[in-house]
Amino acid sequence: MERALLILKPDAVQRGLIGAIISRFEQRGLKFQGLKLMQVDEALARRHYAEHEGKSFFNGLVSYITSAPVVVAVVAGKPGTVELVRAMVGATNPAKAAPGTIRGDFGVDIGRNLIHASDSPESGERETAIFFQPHELIGEWNRALDNWIYE
């Protein structure tokens, strides 16, 4: 199964959008393999955003993601899951995100764009390893409705 890491950022948590956002992924047939509410510390934030270190916005990213609790989740599905998740999330700038996407429906500002999602299957695996220990993840499991979603 292909996996993507999701982070419901501080603005999503503070605005009470956790349930509304999570339900969208469940309704599309994706399976949650891990889910937790946590406070990201500076070291973890710097590790997660390491690819942006040295860029003008790096310190702002670290400061924001550590400012309040976040929800971190791993969703899994068939090949193409990361692409599906990215389409559901919408453009980085909520002003340019299509209606029907998470950012298009709930987002207000590019600096408060609600959610992070892995941008490739490789990133999904790398980011999952940053936020979850193997024992915190549920592997393959079947829901009663899976036969109605997947061929």
Swiss-Prot record:
CDD domains (UniProt xref): NDPk_I (cd04413)
Reactions performed catalytically: a 2'-deoxyribonucleoside 5'-diphosphate + ATP = a 2'-deoxyribonucleoside 5'-triphosphate + ADP; a ribonucleoside 5'-diphosphate + ATP = a ribonucleoside 5'-triphosphate + ADP
GO molecular function: ATP binding; metal ion binding; nucleoside diphosphate kinase activity
Annotated InterPro entries: NDK-like_dom, NDK-like_dom_sf, Nucleoside_diP_kinase, Nucleoside_diP_kinase_AS
Main localization (coarse): cytoplasm
A Gene Ontology term for the protein's cellular component: cytoplasm
Cofactor(s) the record lists: Mg(2+)
Keywords from the named record: ATP-binding, Cytoplasm, Kinase, Magnesium, Metal-binding, Nucleotide metabolism, Nucleotide-binding, Phosphoprotein, Transferase
GO biological process: CTP biosynthetic process; GTP biosynthetic process; purine nucleotide metabolic process; pyrimidine nucleotide metabolic process; UTP biosynthetic process
Subcellular location: Cytoplasm
Residues bound to ATP: 9, 57, 86, 92, 103, 113
Active-site residues from the entry: 116 (pros-phosphohistidine intermediate)
Enzyme Commission identifier(s): 2.7.4.6
Record Gene3D superfamilies: Nucleoside diphosphate kinase-like domain (3.30.70.141)
Subunit structure: Homotetramer.
Its job: Major role in the synthesis of nucleoside triphosphates other than ATP. The ATP gamma phosphate is transferred to the NDP beta phosphate via a ping-pong mechanism, using a phosphorylated active-site intermediate.
Similarity comment: Belongs to the NDK family.
HAMAP family, per the entry: NDP_kinase
Protein name: Nucleoside diphosphate kinase
Record gene name: ndk
